[in-house]
């Protein structure tokens, strides 16, 4: 397993083929992002099952893949359509995944992305406040 193969799985991923992830992740995987820390394949499998049950659509567009020895990186854009975000419209989030491999599978996966871009900016009421704060910080 390498970063390119992981990227290919995420490119193809949808709610009907989540079983593909079992070929990617080590049973002792640690997965982290801005909102979660999950330990073990069963926890990660449940996370993805719940994620895809609650969204209208979720797609990953992989832009770059890099690997040196047992460490890899992916740059990506996720498009997410959820009925409670942005009135059900598509949300685009750019991110980077840091991957570590052991025994041919991903043992560590850390996603870096702006949680505000994905969530807070797309919630009723709170979204406008967050966007205003970000604009003022940029001045």
Language model features with spans:
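Short, aromatic-enriched amphipathic alpha-helices that serve as compact interaction elements
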Residues: 1-16
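A generic structural signal for ordered secondary structure
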Residues: 2, 21, 93-97
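A beta-strand edge to alpha-helix "cap/lid" segment located at domain peripheries
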Residues: 53-59, 63-139
